[in-house]
Amino acid sequence: MKQEKEQGLCSSEVQSQREKFGTNKLPEPELQTTLDFVKDALFSDKIVILLMVMALIQLFLAITGFGTFSEPVMIAVVLGIITAIGVKTGKGVQEANRKLKEKSSLKYCNVIRDGKVQTINKDDIVVGDLVCIELGQDIYADGYIVDGEVSVSNAAINGETIEIHKKPIKGYIPEKITSDSYNNENCLFAGTTVMEGSGKMIVTTVGIDTVNGKTLVDSQTLEAPETALTIALNKLSDFITRWGSIAAFVAFALMVVIEVIGGGYQNQEWMMIFKDIVEKASVALTIIVAAVPEGLPMIVKLVTQQNVVNMEKTNILAVNPNKIPEMAYLNLVCTDKTGTLTTGIMTPEIISGDAFQENLVLNNEAVFDKDGNITGGNSIDRAMLSILLLKDKMKVYDEAMKKEIVARQPFSSKLKFSGVSVKENDVVFSYYKGAPERILEHCTKYIDPVGGDIMDLDVIRRSEIQQQLSEANHKAIRCVAFARKNGQLEKDILPDDMVFEGFVGVRDPLREGVKEAVQTAKEAGIQVIEMTGDALETAIAIAREAGIYEDGDIALTDQEFSEMKDDKIKDILPRLKVIARCAPSTKLRLVTLAQETGMSVAMTGDGTNDSPALARADVGFAMNSGTDVAKAAGDIILTDDNFTSIIRGIKLGRTFMHNINMFLDFQLPINISLLLLNLVFPFFSTGAFLTSALILIINIIMDSLNSLSFGSEPEKEEYMKEKPFVKGTGLFDKQSKLRIGTATTSFSLAYIILMFPCATMFHGEAEQLTARFVLLCFMAVMNGFCVRVEGANLLKGITKNKLFPAIAFGILAGAVIIAQLLYGLLGLAPLNEMQWLVIIVLSMIIIPIDLARKRIASK
């Protein structure tokens, strides 16, 4: 038992344990098959079901000789295309989600094997492994704690919020653990989280066989709730469907009434009357189909999928893809300093004193492995330990590690110190390490760095130390102080009358590109607040270097912030740029108050205590180097922990929303025009404005293909020159409404010209029907060029989205082929050169009208 606890498994045992007890990898959730996606495409939409019913009726009429096969065949072809696109999109999104889940669930832990600390994938844990457990880490397998003490939360498994204290088991370790052991003081369970302390555990059960294995598998299949965007889009679709249905019913009634008044049903066989009514009902149904922008769900899925891929390429893992559009609304980013604004690579710059070396070793989460490499702990822990290498003091480390530790106080960002109690020759004494102002105010003596004598810490010496610390802080050097006292530490209490041992200052340089990213944020209307655990002077120095803080801005300590009333904080919020010695509770309070003022807030975090603020923020950016708790609370994981990636993510979020809006600005004029024209047309002519087959063709072309086209629009630099999207304004701003109104007016004007002044150029119903069809196709393409840019150059950036010109050309070519070659199947007629020229000229009416709108809007 003792040997196992210290050395862990040997390499030869790992594979045999895996073969005997299985892997720790949980089974993959069952994926949808192609047949499942086909069923979804055909039977999840009531309109598609109605289309299939209509196709069967049309087929019956064709078989009985009262109709042609063109209508049911075209409906079947369109349904086939819709199904194919739905299956392709669904499978693509599913595969993207699977890969995202795989990457976001990729977690590592430290185990001891062959007597050395090794970092392994959590899936590679085997029964018998000696696993190191740390604050903020998830427990990945069932087992017993054998060293250290921890408090764990079972909330993720059973909803119980009370933390359970765990301490080492003595003697024999049972082979099995049951759920009856949740409150057992020695048992640890997969799926729970370490909220306090650290230690080691022996694994007894892995994977699906753990107590919570089935629950953990089930949690992988839970669907995310709808976001504000999807709810808004669904409401829009419902609104259009409702009014489209009303318009379809009115159009159907008008066509039947006009037919009756005109005597069309007199002396007709009942089967011919039934055929005519079915055709009119088919047109009415296709009006509903055309009115509803079915491409909306597809473009949301497509753009989300593309953004997840694009973000991953730039070190952004969108574990909650639904939050991608939320980034377009962000106007406040609250960021950590260490590792986010700075490199996180700590280099010792100042070493004041020599008496803290044993404190530095024992009061530290980092260790030297057998090869002499520093592992574990955070960047400051590792920087502290590297001092021993600089001073050639490895003997100090070896001697210190032999001493008996009887109590630990883990570092807390709230308490701002850590501690350790050591027993030597039956005497217990304690070491403390933390923020200099916290340590220094509790010290009454100090160790003379020259002679090593313990002396009174008088006002003069205290002032000298404070001056040294202040000078270091102004140079953006972060300082950590050390002290000692006889006796065992008390939990969460920093004692008085300590002996000051000295301090260390480490430098953490600004990351490359941060200054430029901060400037981009300013130009994009985004406020940046640095929230750091550093001293105020250090925080201001880094913020000034990054361009966050300027003369006239406000920088506060955590204490100053906590003493302010809510209304005062809201008043100064626009000028607030720095909060130093920041506690996690301050982060949560700032997020809450900023949201109350209407701001959309992003918060970064890496610690367990950051999780409430990350969860409360509109978008939570968790650091990849952070705890499992922080990453679980975050929406986005920054795999490089870099501030520049946040700004990049915001740019992609804005691109997402612009692409959605472009599709709506493109699609809705077509939907509205079809509704209006189908309603008005029966007053001026017999029959329908377009046949059901033609409306379905337009619908599949405009909805499905252009959702791919606009979904592929790349990010644009001008998006970061705009102000953020505003909460509560809905999907359409003033300019968007003007674009839709202008385009709808242009469509209507073109058809008025076609149907009246130019009517004599098109002979017979077949040619007129062809003209109406191809004009709509051509105008849609021209409108697409208009909505994708805000300037006069309609070809700007056209090569960056190769799908757009390809689909535009495909639509134009398809319209020509249908009109000139496939006309017989659809009741059309080929057009001559002059007729095509009229169509082309009329389709371009939208360009000067939209340019005029853009000119007026720019003023």
Give the ranges of each region predicted by the language model.
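Cytosolic catalytic regions of P-type ion-transporting ATPases
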Residues: S105-N234, E563-L573
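Non-transmembrane, extramembrane segments of multi-pass ion/lipid transporters
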Residues: G8-D40, S104-V111, I164-H165, G171-Y172, ...
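Membrane-embedded transport module
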Residues: E226, A251, V283, L296, ...
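Cytosolic catalytic regions of ATP/NTP-dependent phosphoryl-transfer enzymes
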Residues: C187-M195, E326-F500, V506, Q519-T520, ...
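Hydrophobic alpha-helical segments characteristic of transmembrane helices
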Residues: N24-L106, S219-T314, K522, T532-L536, ...
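Alpha-helical transmembrane segments of multi-pass membrane proteins
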Residues: D40-I63, L79-T83, L106, D238-Y265, ...
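Conserved catalytic phosphorylation-site environment of P-type ATPases
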Residues: L106-N110, A284, G295-N364, A613, ...
